[in-house]
Amino acid sequence: MNPEEIRQRRLQEMQAKAQEQGAANDPEAQRQAQEQQMQYEMQKQKILRQILSEDARSRLARIKLAKPQFAEQVEMQLIQLAQAGKLPIPLTDEYFKGLLDRIYEMNKPAKKEITIMRR
């Protein structure tokens, strides 16, 4: 099971539990959800520390500051690739840069061209 599937399952479980308790505004349910999110983040950071070299981790941290959504996507893909055994561990900064380029190219929006036809 990949981390994204685990995350989705946990989110569904938390939502179901909140609905069962009728606790849309219950501080206890919010605290539990926040605690589970923190545990998930800690687990993710632990895995990333094992996968990435120090330079690659600092690069990822800078990306996270500039583009949080892109960084989240990169983290998920790194974890999935590492679990599949498709990454050299620890991941060097040079390899990480190449991987970032490939991920960016896959996800960049299609270039829009506007042509003006004159009569």
From Swiss-Prot:
Residues 1-12 have a biased composition (Basic and acidic residues). GO terms for molecular function: DNA binding. One of its GO terms (cellular component) is cytosol. Keywords: DNA-binding. The keyword DNA damage does not apply. It holds the Pfam family dsDNA_bind. The keyword Nucleotide-binding does not apply. Residues 1-37 are annotated as: Disordered. Belongs to the PDCD5 family. HAMAP family: dsDNA_bind (MF_00026). This is DNA-binding protein MmarC7_1157.
